[in-house]
Amino acid sequence: MSSANQANRGEGLTLRQAALIAGFSYLLMPVTFAEFYVFPKLLVPGNIEQTAQNIAAHGRLFFVAILCHFITLTLDVIIAWALYALLAPVNRSLSLLTAWFRLVYTAVALSGLLNLVTVFRLLHTPDYLTLFGAQQLHAQVKLLLSSFRYDFSMGLVIFGIHLALLGYLIFNSSYIPRILGILLSLLGIGWIIYCLGPYLYPTAPLGFIPLAGFGELLFPLWLVIRGWKIPSGLQVRLFNTADLACSRSSKRRTDSSRRSTPVEGISGSAE
């Protein structure tokens, strides 16, 4: 077997496989449990004392919410990889850029998640209450919870750019409905406006935009329900190591031929 064939073994990922991996990873995200069950139960708007008491009394539930966010961000990395493979045939460089935007969003969101970890530690370590006192401790908890939301909001700006580029790639593909591309691009622009709007236009009514975010679920549903119908013959090499192996082999042959060719100046002086 040639070195090029050896280098290419195990690297192929069909578009069908990439679609199913991305779709199931989307649907397995547990962040909705944290955002729509745990946080409304524990976080009381405008009452940091009650919020701190709730987190202290239900520490395990609060930690589960943190874990849900962490699992979701881990799945985001898998989705970035799968979507890159799925859309590389459309435009490999733009697909790579789109994946990088999702990875950067994941990193920003993960840094924000660390604020919740600090909140958990502050409220479940008795020494901190003795050291800071209740009032100062509650002030720190309030600051950390606000920082989590602000960091996550800035991450959503980057996520919006990712969705806009993703929609463009889908619109220009021949194996995913164009309407999904239009929808994702509009959602991406919507997230950017929603996150930056309070700073640019504080009075603008933008509260409806997060509800439109549920439209993003149409994409993973299509990937799971219809993605298996994408022709399996379409395959992507994620890393072009076959060409790299051929290039290295050619370079070795060139170097070998150079060493075997006598240099005229040296042979003449030897005579």
Report the location of each language-model feature.
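Hydrophobic, aromatic-enriched alpha-helical segments typical of multi-pass transmembrane helices
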Residues: M1-R248
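Glycine-centered secondary-structure boundary/capping sites
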Residues: L200-Y201, S269-E271
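Basic polycationic patches enriched in arginine
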Residues: R248, R252-R253, R258-R259
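Short, intrinsically disordered C-terminal tails of secreted or membrane-associated proteins
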Residues: S257, T261-A270
